[in-house]
Amino acid sequence: TPQPPLPRPTASASADSTAERPSIIVIMDEAYADISTLNPEFGDTLFYKKLHKNTIKGLALSSVYGGGTANSEYEFLTGNSMAFFNHGISVYQMYIKAPAYSMAAHLKGLGYETLATHPFHRQGWSRETIWPLLGFETTTFLEDYPQKKKLRDYVSDREMFEYIIDKFEHKKKPLFLYGVTMQNHSGYIPDGKSQKLQVPLKQYPGYPDAELYTGLIRESDKALKYLLHYFEQVKEKVVIVFYGDHFPGLNKEFYKEVYGKEFTSLKERQKLYKVPFFVWTNYESKSVDVPLTSLNYLSNYVYKVAGIRLPAYNRVL
């Protein structure tokens, strides 16, 4: 997908001024998708759509559906596209064997603290091995979280965002934090722990997995609102990046019913690979609505609004 025009960096964020460099917090939210992109009548308005000031937002193509989270990480962090790899492989586990270029490595070279965090097992997708190779000085996992605010059996987005705020408050240098959430992970079969999260979908009855998923996304939105409210009040410059890794693997009949027909053409199937994203700043920056881009291009938007000179590879992108 061609990359839409990038906003110019604001004059107040000089490309070479260490003092002006903002902290950058990136959140890849598990299975965060906007089902109303299949049919506006679905009607569940997500929080990101309400962001207008100092916000770049839109949809981005992910290379995966229903799983394969690490490949969405790889695309964002490196700028590389999964289009050039065999279908179904995990780049993390098959190809990264030595230190590799990434956004984390570049920002580390500019003097940033680099932290990657995921409130689940460190062995997942070999993150405990791969993240340091991508330039993350510090990595934290499930055992580093209080685990007092779980939804189902997973650390909630709210607890993770509180953890992120704590790390921000204790940084010694500008912070680049990359967080991968766990709250909305499959499966979506309601049980005693999760029934209270279900949101009745009157137009589409008979899909308890979709009802549970909708409730989880509403919890994500509440947590996201909390996070941005906190950073709105922070005087230091901060960039918040948020995107979904992939569409959830819900009942295919549910998607067919929402869309109104089978997903037959390539263009129609791509609808299940479009995830929301936004890049928000707590300082003045140009707002842009992006109809469609790809996850591997998102770092360019981040560098621009942060006032950081694009690395050579990103200039090629």
Question: Residue locations for each model-derived region?
Answer:
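Solvent-exposed soluble domains appended to multi-pass membrane proteins
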Residues: P5-P22, V26-D29, D34-L317
